[in-house]
Each structure stands twice: as structure tokens, then as C-alpha cells.
């Protein structure tokens, strides 16, 4: 297969919702990974069929026969591997991370490279292909535009310079208020630990420094310990999901027996 066709198909598949790509850590760097069967699903999508009708030289039409389709899909994916666009990988569980000298992450699973690519439906593959998107180009042009705007600051009209002055004052004022609130909440917490240590202390804006949205950082207004924090709530939701999966598997085993 021509390399331009391989890159075209990879670019098409790369950010498709059917691929259900997830974030993982490969060599401590965020990397997208997916299952082989999701790649096959992308090729079966209506969007790919439209592409193949318009540009059959870049997007080869896929046969209706399942065996021939599977063979062609495997051939395309083998080209992905040969061109190092993807590599076979393995998702590690927490206990497996320790065996490989990796520290388990709360947010992303750790990934390692596999030595074989069997193209099984549930086999994981890691993306090594990261084409530039329109957003990337817009960010570059935006940064250049901002730099040029500041370089030309002396040429700005007086009204614009006055506006940026007041805007900068407002920004510094916001930062001052933010750090003021952070200091006050720390003082209140330290004092509360003298009286309600068993509750984990009293926090104003318990989610202020949590990894959540801007407005969510100020919800709720107060809380005790870490039970109101975004991280704790997220952790409890994950535990409930795991427990539900375990119970489901247990019921299936009981039915099988």
C-alpha cells in the first residue's frame, strides 16, 4: 500500500469517536491507546465509506464479504505497524506496575510495549502518530499574534493602552484575592484541627486546589476533612464501579455453576 494512503487512513482513524482511544502513560508520557477491534469498527463506519467513494486511491474501498474485509483491514493495520504509526502494547494493573518498577497513577493506566502483534480484537495498540490539527495551527498563530501585539504596544491608541492597564490591574487584584483566600483557609484549617481533629479539620472551599473546573473549585463552600473534595468523590465512584463489576462477575459465576 502507498505510504500516502497509509497516512491518510491513519489521520482519518486517529481522532474518530468509534476508536474510543484512551489516555495512558507510556514511558511516563501521556499516550493514546485503543483496541484493535475499534480500528476495524472505524473502517466499517459510514464516514469511511464516503471517503472511499470520493478518494479511492487514498481510502481503498472495503469488500462486503467479512473474510475479505478482515484480511484487508489486517493488511492496512500491518502497514500502520511497519510505518511505526502504532505499536502493540499492554495495559498494566496496579500490582503489575510494581513488578515493572512503575508507580501506579490515579488518573491514567501505565502502558508497556509488547514484543508481538497478534491483531486480536482486544489487543491494545499505542499511537506513535500525532498529526497536527487545526487547533494546533490556531494556537501557534494566536501566540504569534499576541507576541506581535505586545511588541507593537507603543503604537496602540491611548484608549487601548488604558484598557489593558485596567485589565492588568483587575488580573492582579483577582490573584491577590485568590492567594488571600488560600491563606485564610489554611489558617482556619490549622485552628480547626485543635478542636475537630477527628473530623479531619474544617476547610473553606475544599476543592480550591483540586483538579476540577473553575466554578467547581468554589463548590461546596465548606467541608470537613477530604470527604467533600473532588479527588475523594472521584475515588469513591471508581470504588463503587469496581465493586459493581465484582458483584456482576460473582453472579455470572454462580449462574454458570
Curated annotation (Swiss-Prot):
Pfam families to which the protein is assigned, alphabetical: Sec62
Gene Ontology molecular function: any one: protein transmembrane transporter activity
GO annotation, cellular component aspect: Sec62/Sec63 complex; translocon complex
Family, per entry: Belongs to the SEC62 family.
Oligomer and partners: Part of a complex that contains SEC61, SEC62, SEC63, SEC66 and SEC72.
Cytoplasmic side stretches: 1-137, 192-257
Function as written in the Swiss-Prot or TrEMBL entry: Required for preprotein translocation.
Transmembrane segments: 138-158, 171-191
Lumenal compartment segments: 159-170
NCBIfam families: sec62 (TIGR00869)
InterPro entries the record matches: Sec62 (IPR004728), Sec62_asco (IPR011553)
Membrane topology term: Multi-pass membrane protein
Subcellular location: Endoplasmic reticulum membrane
PANTHER family in alphabetical order: TRANSLOCATION PROTEIN SEC62
GO biological process entries: post-translational protein targeting to membrane, translocation
Protein name as it appears in the record: Translocation protein SEC62
Keywords: Endoplasmic reticulum, Membrane, Protein transport, Translocation, Transmembrane, Transmembrane helix, Transport
Amino acid at each position: 500500500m502507498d505510504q500516502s494512503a497509509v497516512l491518510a487512513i491513519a489521520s482519518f482513524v486517529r481522532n474518530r469517536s468509534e476508536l474510543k482511544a484512551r489516555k495512558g502513560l507510556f514511558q511516563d508520557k501521556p499516550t493514546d491507546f485503543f483496541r484493535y477491534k475499534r480500528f476495524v469498527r472505524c473502517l466499517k463506519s459510514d464516514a469511511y465509506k464516503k471517503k472511499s467513494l470520493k478518494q479511492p486511491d487514498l481510502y481503498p474501498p472495503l469488500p462486503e464479504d467479512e473474510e475479505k474485509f478482515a484480511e484487508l483491514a489486517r493488511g492496512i493495520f500491518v502497514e500502520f505497524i511497519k510505518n511505526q504509526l502504532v505499536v502493540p502494547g499492554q495495559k498494566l494493573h496496579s500490582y503489575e506496575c510494581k513488578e515493572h518498577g512503575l508507580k501506579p497513577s490515579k488518573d491514567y493506566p501505565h502502558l508497556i510495549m509488547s514484543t508481538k502483534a497478534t491483531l486480536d480484537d482486544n489487543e491494545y495498540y499505542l499511537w506513535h502518530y500525532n498529526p497536527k490539527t487545526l487547533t494546533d495551527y490556531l494556537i501557534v498563530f494566536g501566540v504569534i499574534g499576541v507576541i506581535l501585539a505586545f511588541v507593537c504596544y507603543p503604537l496602540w491608541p491611548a484608549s487601548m493602552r488604558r484598557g489593558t492597564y485596567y485589565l492588568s490591574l483587575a488580573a492582579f487584584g483577582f490573584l491577590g484575592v485568590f492567594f488571600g483566600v488560600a491563606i485564610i483557609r489554611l489558617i482556619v484549617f490549622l485552628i480547626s484541627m485543635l478542636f475537630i481533629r477527628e473530623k479531619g479539620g474544617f476547610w473553606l472551599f475544599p476543592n480550591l486546589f483540586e483538579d476540577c473546573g473553575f466554578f467547581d473549585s468554589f463548590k461546596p463552600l465548606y467541608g470537613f476533612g477530604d470527604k467533600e473534595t473532588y479527588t475523594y468523590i472521584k475515588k469513591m465512584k471508581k470504588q463503587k464501579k469496581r465493586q459493581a463489576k465484582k458483584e456482576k462477575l460473582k453472579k455470572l459465576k454462580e449462574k454458570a455453576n
